């Protein structure tokens, strides 16, 4: 199944200055690990290069979308060139049949792929972190149903959306 997982602030912001905004949120990191461990993660080169993102992510198949030479981003298990990125992501379901495919960023890839995402794991971080990259929250709520809301703590809650 193709899924996406992302943390957003109250305005749908996901990054600032090419990195995760705001203070590190341990609850969100635990949620991310719990859901993506032993699965396939798909990300763009900006997410791969984020200094707060240890790459490759351990105990996961790491797939990198890049138009650049693979040697610039060593360590990925597979590279997608992005010629027809939605089809390439969908083809991963035929390769990794026993694992979920999690799209983990960045914003352009998330926004472009919402049409093929069957479940979206959304962490709502309370506050506005003056982000410069956003995902379209309305696109999620207009095309999916909220199936679960999980209260966490005073910093965030988790939502699972499904088509």
Please tell me what each predicted stretch does.
Residues 1-163:
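Enzymes that bind and transform nitrogen-containing heteroaromatic metabolites
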């Amino acid at each position: 199944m193709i899924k996406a997982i992302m943390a957003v602030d109250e305005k749908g912001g996901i990054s600032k200055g090419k990195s995760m905004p705001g203070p590190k949120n341990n609850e969100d990191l635990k949620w991310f690990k719990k859901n993506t461990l032993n699965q396939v993660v798909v990300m763009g080169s900006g997410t791969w290069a984020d200094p707060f993102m240890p790459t490759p992510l351990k105990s996961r198949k790491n797939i990198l979308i890049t138009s650049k030479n693979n040697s610039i981003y060593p360590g990925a298990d597979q590279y997608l060139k992005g010629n027809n990125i939605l089809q390439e992501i969908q083809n991963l379901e035929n390769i990794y049949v026993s694992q979920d495919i999690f799209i983990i960023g960045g914003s352009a890839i998330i926004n472009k792929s919402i049409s093929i995402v069957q479940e979206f794991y959304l962490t709502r971080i309370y506050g506005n972190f003056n982000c410069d990259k956003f995902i379209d929250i309305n696109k999620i709520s207009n095309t999916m149903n909220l199936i679960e809301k999980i209260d966490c703590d005073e910093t965030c809650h988790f939502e699972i959306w499904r088509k």
